Swiss-Prot record:
GO CC entries: DNA-directed RNA polymerase complex
InterPro entries per record: DNA-dir_RNA_pol_bsu_ext_1_sf, DNA-dir_RNA_pol_bsu_external_1, DNA-dir_RNA_pol_su2, DNA-dir_RNAP_su2_dom, DNA-dir_RNAP_su2_hyb_sf, RNA_pol_bsu_bac, RNA_pol_bsu_CS, RNA_pol_bsu_protrusion
Native source species: Campylobacter lari (strain RM2100 / D67 / ATCC BAA-1060)
Signal sequence, renumbered to the chain: none
Organism lineage string: Bacteria, Pseudomonadati, Campylobacterota, Epsilonproteobacteria, Campylobacterales
Name under which the protein is recorded: DNA-directed RNA polymerase subunit beta
Catalysed transformations (reactions): RNA(n) + a ribonucleoside 5'-triphosphate = RNA(n+1) + diphosphate
Quaternary state and interactors: The RNAP catalytic core consists of 2 alpha, 1 beta, 1 beta' and 1 omega subunit. When a sigma factor is associated with the core the holoenzyme is formed, which can initiate transcription.
Keywords for this protein: DNA-directed RNA polymerase, Nucleotidyltransferase, Transcription, Transferase
Length: 1377
C-alpha cells in the first residue's frame, strides 16, 4: 500500500490485517532517554542531571563551619557543528553551567553547634565538554561518531532461587538476594544443615540472627516474628494445649487425646475440615501435647521463678524430661512451634550457631549487650583486622543498608520489593527497611517449604534496560562522588582564611569531565558506530547488551542467560544476535517494542472480550502479562471481529495451551511483532531455519552501499520504515510545494497560519563514513511537486525512492556450473561488471602530522631529498597531492621532511652544500606514502595549522574556497527569504480591500476591490512598498510588522553567517606538539571481483569464484542470459527455503514488469486505459483491497509514473509470517505465464544445447558485503621482525608474514619435503645469520649456504638460564669428538 510516508512507490501488500498503529519510531528509546538526562524538552520536571546533583549536594564540613549547596544548572549551546567536529577531531559537546552556593556558619565555640549564617556566596562553575547527542542519535567523540548501546541488566529488587547443592548430592539449596542499584548486596542462604545464613557482598556468611540482632531485635522478638507461639498448660501432670482446628489440618503426627486421655483422632490420618468442625461442636477445647514431642521443642519466653525472680530457663532452651519436671510447677509456659505448616527450624538453628560466636566475642570485647556484639561481628566480617568500637560498628551496619548516600534501590527496586513481598512501603523510600529484611527471610523459609514462588532471573520482569540517560547519570554520580571526597578533604585542610574561600576553590570540575569522557572513550557500551548502511546504523542504536559495567562477563555467562526466553515474545528479537562468544548476550529490540519509564520492555496487544477482538491496543510488560491468555495474530477472525473457532491455540506464562475463545484476554497486534527490524526485512522468514535467518539478518547489516541503489522486487514493507527513521534520508518538516531543487539544496514553499514560508534542506555529498563507505544524498522530488509532512524528499545511501535498498535484484539459476560453484561459491556474469551493478565507492582518510621536535620543526613541503622530480609531479607547491590525482601504491600523498640531528659536516659536505643549496643535508624524508593496497582518486584535502604558524598556499586556497561557498549559500538563503517576504506581503494584500483607486500592471482597481494574488506577485518589491499606502492603517501596520520580522530574520541569518566565518578564521585546535595536520581523502571504486563475499537475505552466503563472459552464461528460451549461478546443494541441508520462494515471487515480478513495459512499447491510443486495467488486475491478488482503491484514485500522470517503476519489476511486500500462500502463487504464476513448478528450460551458453533438466530460475535480491578481497589480499617480501623471537610479525597492518603453524609443518613432514621444511623453519623464520647470508648469496647468484641456529633456540636456552640452569652449547669440532 502506498503509505503517505513511503516515497513514490506502490507495493502489492500481502498483509492479512490492516496496520492499526504505526511502528513506533525506531530510535525513540535513546532520544527520550538523553532528552530526560539533559532536560531538553520538558522545562518543568526535574532532569536526570539535576537528580544526580541533588543526591550529592549539599556537602557539609565535618566541623559544621561551611556547607556547599547546589542551586541550579544550565546547559549551553554547542560551539561547532557536527561536520566541523568530525573534520577537526573535536567532541560535539556543550558546557554545563552549575550554580553553587557556599554558606559560612556562625559556630558556638563551646558546643560546636551552628548558631546562624555568617555569609553566603554564590558562584557559577563550568563543567566543560558534556557530549551532546546529535540529531542522528549518536555522539561525536574526538571527531569519531560513536553510539552508546542500551544495557540489559538485572533489575534491582529481591530474587529467590533454587540451585543444586555443590557439596551434597541431590539436594537443592535455596537462596534469596536483595539487589540494589547502588550499595551492598545482601544474600540469604541455607547450608546443608538447614541453618539460615546471610552474607553481605559475598563476604563470609554469618547466621541470619546476627543480622537481626545487629538491627536491634531482641531474641524473643525474633522468635515471635518467625514462629507461631504455642502456650502449654500444665494440668494434673498432663501438658495440654488449646485445640485450634487450623493447626491440625492435613496429617496429624501424633494421636490426638482429649483432657481425659481418650483418643479423638489417630496419628497419620488426614484431618478434614469437616471432622475438625465436628470436634469443635463436640466441645473439645483442650488436647494433650505428647511429652515425647515436647522434649525436642524450644522455649519461646524465659521461665522465671515467681517468688525469687530468678530466671530458671532462658528463651530458646531445648526442653528435656528433667527440665519439664522443673517446669511443671509453672501453670503455663510458651514454646516456639517449629512444626507448624510453612516454617522450619532454620531460625532456631541460626540461634544455636550464633550463640557460640557471641560467647567468644563477649570474652574478647567485654560487652554484654548481644545486639552490640552482633554489630561488631558484622563489622569484623566486612573489615577483617581493623580495630572496632561498638558505636562505629552500629553506624557501619546502619550505613550499609539505611543510608541513602550509600544505598539506593531506586524506584524500580522498591516497586519490585513491594510486589514480591506484599509490602506497601512508599516508592520514595529507596533504602532498605527492617521489614524488607524480615519479610525476605520469611518468604525464603516459605520457598524452602514449598509455599513460595521461585523467580526466574532471565524473565524480562527481572531484567531491565538502562539507556544512555541512565548510564550517563550513573557515570556522573561516580564523578561527583569522587569530587565530593576531594571537597571533604579540602574542608578538613582549611584552617585559616575560611572567610575568603570561594566555591571555585573547593570544586574541581575536571573530575566530572574526566569520568564522563572515560565512559565515552573507553566504556564497553560506547561503541564505534557501525555505519556501513542505514540498517546497520538503526540496529546498532537499538541494540541491547548484557555486558558492560554492572552487567555480565562474557566468559562466565551461562547457557540460560543466552537462551531465548518465553517473555522475549514481542519484546526482544529471537533471531538477531551475533554468532560466536557473544551469542545471546547482545540482542535487539523487537519491531513494535517500547521501553517504559522504569526501563521494562513492553509489547503491544489488542484486547479481547468474550471472544470479540476490540480495537483497543495496550502495551504490557512481562510482569503485567503473567497469567493472561494470549492468542496468536494468525487466529481466524470474522468481519465483526469475533474469533471464529471455539478453541484456539494461545500462550499463558510461556506455555502453549488450547483455550476456549471466551477465555482469551489478549491477541497479538500482528505476526511480525516477534522479530526485530533486521529479521523483519527477510521475506518468507517463516520458511527459513533460525540459524540461517540469524546469518541473514546479520549480513544485511554488512551490505555496502552501491553506486546506484535498487529497491527489492520482493520486500516486506519494512523498507520504508527504516528509511523513515534513519537520519540518512531527508524528511520534509512541513508540507508544501517544491520551489527549487538542485544537487545540494531543496527549497519547499508552503503556507501555515502565519502565511507562506520557505524551508531549506541541505544535502551532503561524498562524505566518508566510519566504515569507509560513501555517504551521499540525492533529491527524489521534482520542482512543482507537492510534498506532505514527513515525506522523504532526498534519499541517503542504500535508499531508493524512500525505501531501504541494500542490494540488487539479479536473475539467478540454481544449477552447478562446471564445478565453479562448489561449496557455496558464486558464478557471476560479466554483464554485472559491465553495468556496474555491484560497484561501490569507498573513501579512505590518510593523515599526516608535522610536529615540533628538539632539532627543529617538521615541514610539509614538495622539497624532498633523494626523490625523483617525476615522483613529485602530482604534488602542488605545498607538497600535498592535488585533488583529482590518480593514486597508485607507493605514490607520495603528502611530502614531509623531518630535521636530522646536526652533526659537524665534513669539508666535502660543506662544499656540496655551498654549491647545491642548504637543504639536502640535514633533513630526512618522512613523507606519507600510499599503502600497497591503495588505489584511487584524491577527492578532498583538509589542512589544519596551529596558531602562530604560517598557513601555506594550499591552506589559504582552501580557506578562500570555503569562504566563497559560505557566501554563495548565504546569498541563496537571502534570496529565498526575500521571496518568502514578497509572498507573505502579497498574501496579506490579496486578502485586504483597497482604500483608494489604484492602477496595477496597467489594470485599474476601484476602492474596496481586492487584487488577485497572481497580479500582486508580478510587481517588484519596491513597487509593493508604495502600493501598501493604498490600504487601510491596519494593513499598513501588519505590513510593517512583517517587514520588521523579516529584517530580524535577515539579521539572524547574517549573524549565523558571521559566526561560521569566524569559526573558519579561527586557529585550529591541534594536540600539543603538532604544528600542522593534513588529511587526504582518497576515493576508490571497487568493482565486483573474484574473492568478494556476496549473500542473499536468507543466510545464503558465498564467495565469487568466477566471472564468466555473458555469452557463456546459460540463457532462457527468450535469449536472456542469467546473471548469477548458485549451487542447488546449498539449500536442502541448510533449510532456508525462503530463498526459493523469494526467487519465485521475484520472477513473477519481473515477468509482470515485462508485460507492463510491453504496453509502454506498443504505445497504442488507449495505452493508459490498458495500463490501468493491467495494474488493477495485478492488484487484485492482494488480500486487502487497499491498492486497488488507491490505483483507482490516481490521475493519468500519476498512474504513468507508478507504471514506469513497475515496468522494471512489479514490487511486492510479503510481511514476515504472512507470506504468499500456494494458492496465491498459482494465481500469480498464471498471470505471469510461468510454469506451475516455477522451473524454466535453460540452454548452455557455451554449446547452445538445451540443458537435460528444467532449472529453477528466479529473481533474488543479492547483497555485496563489506568483506572485500581488495582489503584482505596481502603479500610480504621482506619486512619487520618481532624483537624477542626474531620471527616475522603477523597481520596485514604490520606488513607481516603468513604463519607456518604446527599443522602446516605436519603436512610437509607427511610429504617428506625435508629441504622445504628446513628452509621454512630457519631462514624464512628466525635464523638471523642464515637469512642475512642467504640474501647475500642470492644477490651474488651463489648457492644458499647451510643454515645457522634459529633464534628460538637461544630464547629457550635463555629462559632456562633465567631459571638458574646453566645451559651451554658445545660444538662438535671444539672437543675434537
Amino acid at each position: 500500500m502506498l503509505n503517505s510516508q513511503s516515497g513514490n512507490r506502490l507495493r502489492i501488500d500481502f498483509s492479512n490485517v490492516p496496520q492499526q498503529i504505526d511502528i513506533p519510531n525506531l530510535l525513540q528509546l535513546q532520544k527520550k532517554s538523553f532528552d530526560y538526562f539533559l532536560n531538553i524538552d520538558a522545562k518543568n520536571s526535574e532532569s536526570g542531571i539535576e537528580k544526580v546533583f541533588k543526591s550529592i549536594f549539599p556537602i557539609h564540613d565535618p566541623q559544621n563551619r561551611l556547607s556547599l549547596e547546589y542551586v541550579s544548572s544550565e546547559v549551553g549551546k554547542p560551539k561547532y557543528t557536527i561536520r566541523e567536529c568530525m573534520e577537526r577531531g573535536l567532541t560535539y559537546s556543550v558546557n554545563l553551567k552549575m550554580k553553587i552556593r557556599l554558606t559560612l556558619h556562625e559556630k558556638d565555640e563551646k558546643t560546636g553547634e551552628k548558631i546562624g549564617i555568617k555569609d553566603i556566596k554564590e558562584q557559577e562553575i563550568y563543567i566543560r565538554e558534556i557530549p551532546l547527542m546529535t540529531d542522528r542519535i549518536s555522539f561525536i567523540i574526538n571527531g569519531v561518531e560513536r553510539v552508546v548501546v542500551n544495557q540489559l541488566h538485572r533489575s534491582p529488587g529481591v530474587i529467590f532461587k533454587e540451585e543444586e547443592s555443590s557439596t551434597v548430592a541431590n539436594k537443592l539449596v535455596y537462596t534469596a538476594q536483595i539487589i540494589p542499584d547502588r550499595g551492598s548486596w545482601l544474600y540469604f542462604e541455607y547450608d546443608a544443615k538447614d541453618v539460615l545464613y546471610v552474607r553481605i557482598n559475598k563476604r563470609r556468611k554469618v547466621p541470619i540472627t546476627i543480622l537481626f540482632r545487629a538491627l536491634g531485635y531482641k531474641k524473643q522478638d525474633i522468635i515471635k516474628l518467625f514462629y507461631p507461639i504455642q502456650t502449654i498448660h500444665v494440668k494434673k501432670d498432663k501438658f495440654l494445649t488449646e485445640f485450634n482446628p487450623n493447626d491440625f489440618l492435613d496429617r496429624v503426627e501424633y494421636d490426638l487425646k482429649d483432657e481425659k486421655g481418650n483418643i479423638i483422632h489417630q496419628a497419620g490420618k488426614r484431618m478434614t475440615k469437616k471432622k475438625a468442625e465436628q470436634l469443635v461442636k463436640d466441645g473439645i477445647k483442650w488436647v494433650e501435647y505428647p511429652v515425647e514431642i515436647l522434649t525436642n521443642r524450644y522455649l519461646a519466653n524465659p521461665i522465671i521463678n515467681k517468688e525469687t525472680g530468678e530466671v530458671l530457663f532462658d528463651s530458646l532452651t531445648l526442653l528435656d524430661e528433667s527440665k519439664l519436671a522443673k517446669i511443671k510447677e509453672q501453670k503455663t509456659f510458651d514454646i516456639a512451634n517449629d512444626l507448624a505448616n510453612g516454617v522450619d527450624a532454620a531460625i532456631i538453628n541460626s540461634f544455636i550457631q550464633d550463640n557460640e560466636t557471641l560467647k567468644l566475642l563477649k570474652q574478647t570485647e567485654n560487652i554484654d549487650d548481644e545486639n552490640d556484639l552482633a554489630a561488631i561481628r558484622i563489622y569484623k566480617v566486612m573489615r577483617p583486622g581493623e580495630p572496632v568500637v561498638k558505636d562505629a560498628a552500629k553506624a557501619f551496619v546502619n550505613d550499609l543498608f539505611f543510608n541513602p548516600e550509600r544505598y539506593d534501590l531506586t524506584k524500580v527496586g522498591r516497586m519490585k520489593m513491594n510486589h514480591k513481598l506484599g509490602l506497601d512501603t512508599p516508592e520514595y523510600v529507596t533504602v532498605l527497611t527492617n521489614e524488607d529484611i524480615v519479610k525476605t527471610a520469611k518468604y525464603l523459609i516459605k520457598v524452602k517449604n514449598g509455599r513460595g514462588h521461585i523467580d526466574d532471573r532471565d524473565h524480562l520482569g527481572n531484567r531491565r534496560i538502562r539507556s544512555i540517560g541512565e548510564l550517563l547519570a550513573n557515570e556522573l554520580h561516580v564523578g561527583l562522588a569522587k569530587m565530593q571526597k576531594a571537597i571533604r578533604d579540602k574542608f578538613t585542610a582549611l584552617n585559616t582564611d575560611i572567610d575568603k574561600v570561594m566555591p571555585y576553590d573547593l570544586i574541581n570540575p575536571k573530575t566530572i569531565t574526566v569520568t564522563i569522557m572515560e565512559f565515552f572513550t573507553g566504556g564497553q557500551l560506547s561503541q564505534f558506530m557501525d555505519q556501513t548502511n542505514p540498517l546497520s546504523e538503526v540496529t546498532h542504536k537499538r541494540r541491547l547488551s548484557a555486558l558492560g559495567e554492572g552487567g555480565l562477563v562474557k566468559e562466565r555467562a551461562g547457557f540460560e542467560v543466552r537462551d531465548v526466553h518465553a517473555t522475549h515474545y514481542g519484546r526482544i528479537c529471537p533471531v538477531e544476535t551475533p554468532e560466536g562468544q557473544n551469542i545471546g548476550l547482545i540482542n535487539t529490540l523487537s519491531t513494535y517494542a517500547k521501553v517504559n519509564d522504569l526501563g521494562f520492555v513492553e509489547a503491544p496487544y489488542k484486547k479481547v472480550e468474550n471472544g470479540k477482538v476490540s480495537n483497543e491496543i495496550v502495551y504490557l510488560t512481562a510482569t503485567q502479562e503473567e497469567g493472561l491468555v494470549i492468542a496468536a495474530a494468525s487466529t481466524k477472525i470474522d468481519e465483526k471481529g469475533s474469533i471464529v473457532e471455539e478453541f484456539v491455540e494461545a500462550r499463558q506464562d510461556g506455555e502453549t495451551i488450547l483455550a476456549r475463545r471466551e477465555e482469551v484476554h489478549l491477541i497479538d497486534l500482528c505476526s511480525g511483532m516477534i522479530v526485530g527490524v533486521a529479521a523483519s526485512l527477510i521475506p518468507f522468514l517463516e520458511h527459513d531455519d533460525a540459524n540461517r535467518a540469524l546469518m541473514g539478518s546479520n549480513m544485511q547489516r554488512q551490505a555496502v552501499p552501491l553506486l546506484t541503489a535498487q529497491a527489492p522486487i520482493v520486500g516486506t514493507g519494512m523498507e520504508k520504515i527504516i528509511a523513515r527513521d534513519a537520519w540518512e534520508a531527508i524528511k520534509a518538516k512541513r508540507a508544501g510545494i517544491v520551489e527549487k531543487v538542485d544537487n545540494k539544496n531543496i527549497f519547499i514553499l508552503g503556507e501555515d497560519e502565519n502565511g507562506p514560508f520557505i524551508d531549506h534542506y541541505k544535502m551532503e555529498k561524498n562524505l566518508r563514513t566510519n566504515q569507509n563507505t560513501t555517504f551521499t544524498q540525492h533529491p527524489i522530488v521534482k520542482k512543482g511537486e507537492f510534498v506532505q509532512v514527513g515525506q522523504i524528499i532526498a534519499d541517503g545511501p542504500s535508499m531508493d525512492q524512500g525505501e531501504l535498498a541494500i542490494g540488487k535484484n539479479a536473475l539467478i539459476a540454481f544449477m552447478p556450473w562446471h564445478g565453479y560453484n562448489y561449496e557455496d561459491a558464486i558464478v557471476i556474469s560479466e554483464k554485472i561488471l559491465r553495468e556496474d551493478t555491484f560497484t561501490s565507492v569507498h573513501i579512505y582518510e590518510k593523515e599526516v602530522e608535522a610536529r615540533e621536535l628538539k632539532d627543529g620543526v617538521e615541514e610539509i613541503t614538495k622539497d624532498i631529498p633523494n626523490v625523483k622530480e617525476d615522483d613529485l609531479a602530482h604534488l602542488d607547491e605545498s607538497g600535498i597531492a592535488k585533488i583529482g590525482t590518480h593514486i597508485k601504491p607507493g605514490m607520495i600523498l603528502v611530502g614531509k621532511v623531518s630535521p636530522k640531528g646536526e652533526v659537524k659536516p665534513t669539508p666535502e659536505e660543506r662544499l656540496l652544500r655551498a654549491i647545491f643549496g642548504e637543504k639536502a643535508g640535514h633533513v630526512v624524508n618522512k613523507s606519507l606514502y600510499a599503502t600497497a593496497s591503495m588505489e584511487g582518486v584524491v577527492v578532498d584535502v583538509k589542512i589544519f595549522t596551529k596558531k602562530g604558524y604560517e598557513k601555506d598556499a594550499r591552506a589559504i586556497k582552501a580557506y578562500d574556497e570555503e569562504k566563497l561557498n559560505l557566501e554563495k549559500e548565504h546569498h541563496d538563503r537571502l534570496l529565498m527569504m526575500d521571496r518568502e517576504e514578497t509572498l507573505r506581503v502579497c498574501s496579506l494584500l490579496s486578502k485586504s480591500a483597497l482604500n483608494s483607486d489604484e492602477e496595477i500592471n496597467g489594470q485599474k482597481y476601484k476602492k474596496g476591490a481586492k487584487v488577485d494574488i497572481k497580479e500582486l506577485e508580478k510587481i517588484n518589491r519596491f513597487a509593493l512598498n508604495s502600493l501598501v499606502k493604498a490600504y487601510s492603517k491596519d494593513v499598513q501596520k501588519e505590513y510593517e510588522d512583517l517587514k520588521n520580522h523579516f529584517q530580524n530574520e535577515k539579521k539572524k541569518l547574517k549573524s549565523e553567517h558571521d559566526e561560521k566565518l569566524e569559526i573558519l578564521e579561527k586557529d585550529d585546535i591541534l594536540p600539543s606538539g603538532v604544528v600542522k595536520l593534513v588529511k587526504v581523502y582518497i576515493a576508490t571504486k571497487r568493482k565486483l571481483k573474484v574473492g568478494d563475499k556476496m549473500a542473499g537475505r536468507h543466510g545464503n552466503k558465498g564467495i565469487v569464484s568466477n566471472i564468466v563472459p555473458e555469452v557463456d552464461m546459460p540463457y532462457l528460451p527468450d535469449g536472456r542470459p542469467i546473471d548469477i549461478a548458485l549451487n542447488p546443494l546449498g539449500v536442502p541441508s541448510r533449510m532456508n527455503i525462503g530463498q526459493i520462494l523469494e526467487s519465485h515471487l521475484g520472477i513473477v515480478g519481473m515477468r509482470l514488469g515485462d508485460q507492463i513495459q510491453e504496453i509502454f512499447d506498443k504505445k497504442q491510443k488507449d495505452f493508459i486505459k490498458q495500463l490501468r486495467t493491467k495494474i488493477l488486475e495485478i492488484c487484485s491478488v492482494s488480500r486487502l483491497t487497499l491498492e486497488k482503491k488507491f490505483v483507482e484514485s490516481l490521475n493519468d500522470e500519476q498512474l504513468i509514473s507508478y507504471a514506469r517503476d513497475w515496468a522494471r519489476g512489479v514490487k511486492f511486500a510479503t510481511p514476515v509470517f504472512e507470506g504468499v500462500t500456494v494458492e496465491e502463487f498459482s494465481k500469480l504464476f498464471e498471470m505471469a505465464k510461468i510454469a506451475m513448478d516455477g522451473k524454466s528450460e535453460l540452454y548452455d551458453g557455451r554449446t547452445g544445447e538445451k540443458m537435460a533438466e528444467r532449472v529453477h530460475v528466479g529473481c533474488m535480491y543479492m547483497l555485496k558485503l563489506h568483506h572485500l578481497v581488495d582489503e584482505k589480499v596481502h603479500a610480504r617480501s621482506t619486512g619487520p621482525y618481532s624483537l624477542v623471537t626474531q620471527q616475522p610479525v603477523g597481520g596485514k597492518a604490520l606488513f607481516g608474514g603468513q604463519r607456518f603453524g604446527e599443522m602446516e609443518v605436519w603436512a610437509l613432514e607427511a610429504y617428506g619435503a625435508a629441504h622445504t621444511l628446513r628452509e621454512m623453519l630457519t631462514i624464512k623464520s628466525d635464523d638471523v645469520e642464515g637469512r642475512f647470508s642467504a640474501y647475500k648469496a642470492l644477490t651474488k647468484g651463489e648457492n644458499v649456504p647451510a643454515t645457522g641456529i634459529p633464534e628460538t633456540f637461544f630464547v629457550l636456552t635463555n629462559e632456562l638460564k633465567s631459571l638458574a640452569l646453566d645451559v651451554e652449547i658445545f660444538d662438535k669440532d671444539e672437543n675434537n669428538e
